């Protein structure tokens, strides 16, 4: 194979109004290299992948793959034939093998004809068997089932037209991986995957022999799979040979040499670096340490010190000893049992990470805690001092015609944030909307910017118990890191639905895991500790994702 599978020479891209989103990028990609692409929202990461996939040709410079290289591209919103079933969509990826198997059956049937040209049939049989052998085609059904389980695809006969956006993405990703291209271009491949499927994808891409260029905020992927980090910063492409942890070290050193305005960002990076350097044992004691120092987190002096953080979660009323108690909870939808006999109690200071397949009932639990839905049986008891800040309050009610500042402030110069008052522009600035960005229309925002705006609206309530439903979706790593640091310093409790394992390892003191047939397990510890516990008690197979099974309600 050639030395490089893809080369870019002085590539630039201008977007309205005359903004150079990419400038003078010259890069060469080695065969088999695994590259993670980092950068703030709006830095041009998706644009870079569209250029590499040959979709965006309106560029300066030259972007050229090696001849005969097969490129597979996963956009954020993949297009599938709405008339097809899941099975038909997936089989498109292996159509050569499917057609060969079908034709081989026909050839076998033709042997029964005494007038057949047996030499011609034998030659065709040999050619078909060669195709099938090369792709392990006789085990095709096993391969498809394994891939469908790993990415938790909907039923084979489900119509694409009836699937959610997340389900379509999983089907598109599965199809792409089965195509086995020479180079994979993946735009946020972990979005809409649960933590177990993300871990499976990480192992798959680690063993994949081709080149991978992935935009992702999944830092375990960037640490365990990526051999290169490509950072897009103010239009420049800055390559770094090494994984995420080593990139973080050099980034910290680089920021140390830059202007003092980077001080807050450097402080945020140093907190994450401290966690990385502790190793597994030290990391696992962090959750227990948080519970132990809850009183310190609550002190006014401590909160004042942390107001300079990049993202500051305003404290709500002081929490009493009783936070949340769930007893014998049961909830079904139609004939599906989502939650069966769930009981747990949350201590003050806890941050509970909630994991499990999409559609298992994680968001339903939030709606029951906030009183929007009622359980079939069992009780949910909130402590008297608990003030909820629930993620569903604002998610779908943002006005696209308003500016960022208007959407958060309601046009007020001074805002009430929890129990305190502060200038509204200063509060909005805490969510990395600085200066002119506060004048952007909501409808013009990227997914990550909408995520930050949503957090700004949610957190102004000043609750002491946060319910966060996939807050990490679409956030760039800078904002993710800031959110982690803010949660770790927050003098309250939080329940967080997330598939981001690094995020869960840094913040979670407990894990709530949705499993098959309505079973939900409550565990004290972070995500990695929970994985180790599952391996010890159930064996390594317990970590392999499978399509969810719902217990049916007896009629």
From Swiss-Prot:
Cell compartment(s), UniProt: Cytoplasm
Signal peptide: none
GO molecular function, one term: ATP binding
Keywords for the protein's UniProt record, in alphabetical order: ATP-binding, Cytoplasm, Hydrolase, Nucleotide-binding, Protein biosynthesis, Repeat, RNA-binding, rRNA-binding, Translation regulation, tRNA-binding
A GO CC term assigned to this protein in UniProt: cytoplasm
Chief location of this protein within or outside the cell: cytoplasm
Residues at which ATP 2 binds: 356-363
Gene disruption phenotype: No visible growth or ribosome-associated phenotype.
EC number of the protein: 3.6.1.-
GO process annotations (BP): negative regulation of translational elongation; translation
Known catalytic reactions: ATP + H2O = ADP + phosphate + H(+)
InterPro entries per the UniProt record, alphabetical: AAA+_ATPase (IPR003593), ABC_tran_Xtn (IPR032781), ABC_transporter-like_ATP-bd (IPR003439), ABC_transporter-like_CS (IPR017871), EttA (IPR022374), P-loop_NTPase (IPR027417)
Disulfide bonding pattern of the chain: none
Arm: annotated segments: 95-139
Domain ABC transporter residues, every copy: 6-259, 324-550
Residues where ATP 1 binds: 39-46
PROSITE patterns: ABC_TRANSPORTER_1, ABC_TRANSPORTER_2
Stretches for region PtIM: 242-322
Result when mutating residue 188 to Q: Causes growth defect at 18 degrees Celsius in bipA deletion strain
Family: Belongs to the ABC transporter superfamily. ABCF family. Translational throttle EttA subfamily.
Role of this protein: A translation factor that gates the progression of the 70S ribosomal initiation complex (IC, containing tRNA(fMet) in the P-site) into the translation elongation cycle by using a mechanism sensitive to the ATP/ADP ratio. Binds to the 70S ribosome E-site where it modulates the state of the translating ribosome during subunit translocation. ATP hydrolysis probably frees it from the ribosome, which can enter the elongation phase.
Subunit structure: Monomer. Probably contacts ribosomal proteins L1, L5, L33 and S7, the 16S and 23S rRNA and the P-site containing tRNA(fMet).
Recorded domain comment: The arm domain is inserted in the first ABC transporter domain. Probably contacts ribosomal protein L1.
Entry protein name: Energy-dependent translational throttle protein EttA
Organism: Escherichia coli O6:H1 (strain CFT073 / ATCC 700928 / UPEC)
Upper lineage: Bacteria, Pseudomonadati, Pseudomonadota, Gammaproteobacteria, Enterobacterales
